[in-house]
Amino acid sequence: MTTEAKCPFNHSVVGAGTTNRDWWPKQLRVDLLNQHSARSNPLAASFNYAEAFKRLDLQTLKQELRALMTDSQDWWPADFGHYGPLFVRMAWHSAGTYRTGDGRGGGGRGQQRFAPLNSWPDNVSLDKARRLLWPIKQKYGQAISWADLMILTGNVALESMGFKTFGFAGGREDTWEPDQDLYWGRETKWLGGDDRYAHGSPGVDQAHGVLVKDDDSEVQHTRDLENPLAAVQMGLIYVNPEGPDGNPDPLLAAKDIRDTFGRMAMNDEETVALIAGGHTFGKTHGAADAAHVAAEPEASDLESQGLGWHNSFGSGKGGDTITSGLEVTWTTTPAQWSNDFFDHLFGFEWELSKSPAGAHQWVAKNAQAIIPDAHDASKKRLPTMLTTDLALRIDPAYEAISRRFHANPDQFADAFARAWFKLTHRDMGPRARYLGADVPAEELLWQDPIPALNHALIDAQDAAALKQTVLSSGLSVAQLVATAWASASSFRGSDKRGGANGARIRLAPQKDWASNEPAQLAQVLATLERIQADFNARQSGGKQISLADLIVLGGNAAVEQAAHAAGHAVTVPFAPGRMDASQAQTDVESFAVLEPVADGFRNYAKARYAVSAEALLIDKAQLLTLTAPEMTVLVGGLRVLGANTGQSHNGVFTTRPGVLSNDFFANLLDMRTEWKATSETKETYEGRDRATGEHKWTGTRVDLVFGSNSILRAVAEVYASADAQEKFVQDFVAAWTKVMQLDRFDLA
């Protein structure tokens, strides 16, 4: 008899075995709406991170972080006796996953702690950086989140190396499990790129970049990276430092750089500043072949305790470290701010070489060994650069900026400070979310500024009178609801942009978006502006109402009237205090990325996409931070209120539009109706009476999914039930109010 006990569960465990997605890979991901619930959060429901951060002694914490920078540990010794460059990389790679396409990624949730980011090839050794920070995090506990601490540490690292940063804002709350909604690409191998480009791009092997035979310069010049991705290969933050797919061509690399940094909201000047500024510090690591490097953290053994990439070469650390496979130190002052990067970039001619790991890099021609060794003060090395560094000299636009920065170090320092602040704060949303004594006073255009409240607010009596005025103005329930929804639903919970505050729906580019029906929108806004002007002219004591508030109040009035028509007296909660932004405060190009490609709540799609309409609905709902029941009740309510774009009848499953009823659900689930697609594309459907064949309804995939998908049908059945009318109205009002207030960080 063996000493190993027989497993009572036949060697299976909870969660093991074939899953639903194994059987049905295209199953709708309704579960994406259930992320980051209280069930995964170890903190009390009453915990308020903002209040905890406000009590933090930030200056003392920064002093302790500064001391850590030069407190080299034997288990992971600091390059050049200074951890600053490592922590700059940690902060950069935390924030640098942000992309403008959907606002997801970034450092705002502390996701670098979790898979896949904690095990990305581009994040080798950052597990050690976080472990070096653990004693400080342990000391301060929940007074500072991991998300804030990683960014703050990057700032302190720069300051400890003689650089003056632009500022720091806290306010990033940790999450406690990996994000599931982030689309990183479809590749199944690290550093692959075969799916993100239309022409295919085999990528590179796990060791380092290698030139792939079927990629030529012409293809690489014209390839188009899939949206919303902002990295050229699976597991990279931005670009391959050896060049596209390992092709050491600086001009081709410039194209990838411009594309990926642009998708992170950086222009050419910010891009040059970030690359040159970041590469003023530290080094890359490629002491030997990557075959010496073991599994990443998520694949490591229990005894590794969450650390990965064990290195069998030499000591496995210090001068024997292997990360990217490249072995480059850019400056003679790798732990001190200087202009050395540009001095070397333009002061030497460069020839292609290879690192000890076999990766493409560049070495200065006819140069002396002037670069310090990271761990042996008696050694000097030749100046080296990456292919992506040389892009700043070879690309004409980048070169012009680089030469200007070289000649004007103060401009370079200011540009890097501002670009670093933008990099590390881009996903935080408006300044109203910024916390701490180091928040810079200057207001920046990319922060989507909104004027500070400068007038007395309306009271409940004013709101009631204004609602009556709006309802008597000739505007319909559908028009008021659609306008309020269009304004508020531009919000993205990913990067906290958009929303009703600012009334940017009246400004370019939002006023011209097809989803907002520009002609109807102009009519509604003109009427509301007249009501606003008339009300404000009659007030005393500085009381005013903004158009942003009036748009929401008008939508609330329409919802109340529709509920009353259904026999339910409700008052939709309303909190005044929104302000109106100006066109000068609105970056048209920056806001363009917020335009919806689809909005299932309005049965709108800009075009037909490879992604299903119902999947795009889930995506939109997730960006609006909605749960599955909230999404369901909103779709059903908006349909019967007539909020469809273009006044489409698709999904309007009611004979009494404008009445806030549960008719959408009752009629969708009516077994007397038989549904058939109207074309081979199966985008729209027709519902006919099973017995008579009489036409009853038309609907889209977004409508029918609430009867087709088993999870959504379960929710829809609740609202379709005979006893659900009052619950439906109350739940709709609650979900509507949530969307209207998503950007009201001042109410928190």
Curated annotation (Swiss-Prot):
Pfam families cross-referenced by the UniProt entry: peroxidase
Cross-link (Tryptophyl-tyrosyl-methioninium (Tyr-Met) (with W-92)): Y238-M264
Co-factor binding details: Binds 1 heme b (iron(II)-protoporphyrin IX) group per dimer.
Binding residues for heme b: H279
Keyword Oxidoreductase attached: yes
Cofactor(s) the protein needs: heme b
Processing and modification events after translation: Formation of the three residue Trp-Tyr-Met cross-link is important for the catalase, but not the peroxidase activity of the enzyme.
PANTHER family hit by this protein: CATALASE-PEROXIDASE, HYDROPEROXIDASE I, BIFUNCTIONAL CATALASE-PEROXIDASE
Active site: H93 (proton acceptor)
Signal sequence range: none
Protein name as annotated: Catalase-peroxidase
Biological role: Bifunctional enzyme with both catalase and broad-spectrum peroxidase activity.
Gene: katG
Assembly information from the UniProt record: Homodimer or homotetramer.
Covalent link (Tryptophyl-tyrosyl-methioninium (Trp-Tyr) (with M-264)) residue numbers: W92-Y238
Catalytic activity: H2O2 + AH2 = A + 2 H2O; 2 H2O2 = O2 + 2 H2O
Keyword terms: Heme, Hydrogen peroxide, Iron, Metal-binding, Oxidoreductase, Peroxidase
Coiled coil: none
Site for Transition state stabilizer, residues: R89
EC numbers on record: 1.11.1.21
SUPFAM superfamilies named among the record's database cross-references: Heme-dependent peroxidases (SSF48113)
HAMAP family the UniProt entry points to: Catal_peroxid
